[in-house]
Amino acid sequence: MIVARRYVIGGRVQRVGFRYFTEAAAAREGVLGWVRNMPDGRVEVVAEGDAEAVERFERSLRHGPPHARVERVDVDDMVPTGRETGFIIK
């Protein structure tokens, strides 16, 4: 089953390689979508893919790269669009 989710990650998640870590996790799991820094210091991610792959991807987001400190992850389910063709850093 294909699912789509939006994540907003808070904590020490900018200037620690979080977007590149997220891009690598998406490639590893075959997840499509994008990641971007938000002006308020959080990171936003939209992910679409197989439900099990998105769950594994989410576990990676909750852990983060070595220098990050993930304090909060807000998750919203979305309707999969099928429009994503890869995973990009915005």
What residue spans do the PLM features occupy?
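Intrinsically disordered, low-complexity, mixed-charge
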Residues: 1-90
